[in-house]
Amino acid sequence: MPVYNLEFQIYINVPAKAAYDHLNDPHHFVGLQPLLTHVDTVKYGEQDGCKTVSYETVEAFRWQGIVLYRNRIRVQTVFTRPPEQFNTVVHSFPNITLHVEYTFTPKDNGVLIKETTQVHAYAWLAKFVTNEATRVQNILLANLKNRLET
């Protein structure tokens, strides 16, 4: 299955730990990520000495305001280097997997957040998936900036 790489970054005028702490609660993604409608089945654990959180969520794909498809996705986040980095794996239908790494670098009085995403998707779906991921992640980061700076 082909792999597609995406990268996003944003500067937010808050301490790195504040941004990191906000994103390590999966419920905070509702309202940040425009497709998510809710988060459920949240489970906390540990993997290789790192704290983890696993959960399920639903993405609602709309066309002209009408929900056409609800996509249940499974997510696992490993907090690899708090408060500097965490990694998330997203599993979605049909056999789409996203490996996402967030890094939080203090800069001036705020934080530079960098998101690196590897999208594993069938070639026939790749353009839709990468375009949608790009659109959604840009909105997520802009919403995060707005939420944390106001």
Sequence positions of predicted segments:
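Hydrophobic ligand-binding cavity/cleft-lining segments
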Residues: 1-51
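Short, solvent-exposed secondary-structure boundary motifs
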Residues: 1-2, 29-35, 63-70, 90-95
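Short beta-strand micro-motifs in enzyme catalytic cores
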Residues: 4, 51-53, 100, 111
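Beta-strand elements of well-folded, non-transmembrane domains
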Residues: 12-16, 57-63, 79-81, 92-96, ...
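Hydrophobic pocket/interface hotspot
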Residues: 18-23, 29, 77, 113-115, ...
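Glycine-rich portal/gate segments that line the openings of hydrophobic small-molecule binding cavities
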Residues: 41-91, 143-150
